[in-house]
Amino acid sequence: ITARTIGSFVLPYFKVCEKNGDAHFFDPSQISDGTLRILGILLALYHTPHPSLMVVEEPEQPVNPALLALLSDACNEASERTQLLITSHSPYLVDLFDPEKIRVVTMQNGETRVAPIRRSQREAVKEHLLSLEQIMSSEGLLPEDA
């Protein structure tokens, strides 16, 4: 990624190199919204100094599902040095993460409650009876009882 100044604006340009050494430059208007979103998230995940907390809302929007595995790998790696809070309604994305690291957020009596996934659901995933994607698509992820 490079930057070019045009008037009073600084615009990012993306350099893509082929195996033969040829380089091509693309401005943001030539790149899909999903690719730009993934690049932005990856830049934030690998930014130094590392922030103590990073929040990403619905990273799956509007991203090609094939790229979500790459994103989850990067998030898992970054979580070793930065606390990550990722919100998602995507069963496919949720399925790419460790059930022990996932929290369910609910509203009860006007209060927000954050809890681990219900033990029975975590055990079903651990025993390979169901995937998180299947659970989320059927009954939904349920919070552990207090």
Segment roles from a protein language model:
Residues 2-46, 59-66:
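Conserved ABC ATPase signature
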Residues 6, 19, 50, 99, ...:
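Short strand-connecting beta-turns/loops that link adjacent beta-strands
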Residues 24, 52-53:
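The start of beta-strands in P-loop NTPase/AAA+ ATPase cores
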Residues 33, 47, 95-99:
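Generic structural "secondary-structure junction" signal
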Residues 48-51, 74:
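Residue-level detector of alpha-helix boundary/anchor positions
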Residues 54-58:
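Catalytic Walker B motif of ABC-type/P-loop ATPase nucleotide-binding domains
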Residues 69-146:
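C-terminal lobe/lid and adjacent interdomain/linker elements of RecA-like ASCE P-loop ATPase modules
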